Amino acid sequence: MEERSMQKAGFLKEPIKHIGITKHNVVPMVEEMADMAFQARNLARAAFIVDLMQKDKECAVILTLAGSLISAGLKQVIIDMLEHNMVDVIVSTGANIVDQDFFEALGFKHWKGSQFVDDSELRELAIDRIYDTYIDEDELRVCDDTIAIIANSMQPGAYSSREFIVEMGKYIEEKGLDKNSIVYKAYEKGVPIFCPAFSDCSAGFGLVHHQWHNPDQHVSIDSVKDFRELTKIKIENDKTGIFMIGGGVPKNFTQDIVVAAEVLGYENVSMHTYAVQITVADERDGALSGSTLKEASSWGKVDTVYEQMVFAEATVAMPLIAGYAYHKRNWEGRPARNFNAMLDAKPVNA
């Protein structure tokens, strides 16, 4: 056992560090990129549009997160955006929020690794690999167990993922855990986080454990309630902008709230006024992740005046785009919407 621990420690030596957006003023570089070509020009235009979302004080900004972003070092970018009131709603995969951000709030880390490795050896040592990044599987099990503990502490019933993630924020506060966390900062700021596929991550393991041992009275996650709550935000704040990192469920879920509002009788609801997506997916296979924002306009989801696709990897493009908007400082004077308070005051009944 001691030999195994030493072998494992040999792999888990250098932690991933999170880059922020407040330190380096990237505005001059991004503005010069506007006169280049290809994805440099697209990135610059995307940065201008994200900045327009900050200038437009009527616009509620929705940030969507897909892909392995927090483990890759983007946590501080998102925390900086939350801290400076640049984001009003987050829609994410469960992995980013639970397996990665909440995991780090528990005191654990992600580690620099290599894609050129014997994966069978990693398996023997209980090390999980995300391309060139390592995670301690034994620590992930602690995260799973913590989700079960939180569920066990709640009144049985159906909750939106947003409501459950608020409880995760409370847990961080009550247990004196690391508050440099997306979950905690959003909890503190009243910014709702939705994970429409919440069970597809460590939350799923924790919740299935909770329900298995509490078959008659237990907590469950109502994804339709997620959809209704997010649609209610669109109805209450008609002008919206979406900054999408990756695609997947968070992208489609967020685009669909325009159509959902129409289905509920709000026929004059506006399409998303502003839209930016960073992706490496291809539009030619017809899948959602690479579908263009112009395509989304045919579905009545996204206006085409201020939209931009950036075909780039998120760890490169997101800090530049978010950093540009931060250093333009048009977020100053944006109203704090605190949609959590709005949803809790006017609950969407399960």
Curated annotation (Swiss-Prot):
EC number: 2.5.-.-
Keywords: Transferase
Disulphide bridges: none
Record's keyword annotation contains Cytoplasm: no
Keyword Lipid biosynthesis: no
SUPFAM superfamilies linked: DHS-like NAD/FAD-binding domain
Classification via Gene3D superfamilies: Deoxyhypusine synthase
Enzyme class, broadest EC rank: transferase
GO cellular component assignments: cytoplasm
Highest taxon of source: Bacteria
GO molecular function: deoxyhypusine synthase activity
Family that this chain belongs to: Belongs to the deoxyhypusine synthase family.
Protein name stated in the entry: Deoxyhypusine synthase-like protein
Organism: Chlorobaculum tepidum (strain ATCC 49652 / DSM 12025 / NBRC 103806 / TLS) (Chlorobium tepidum)
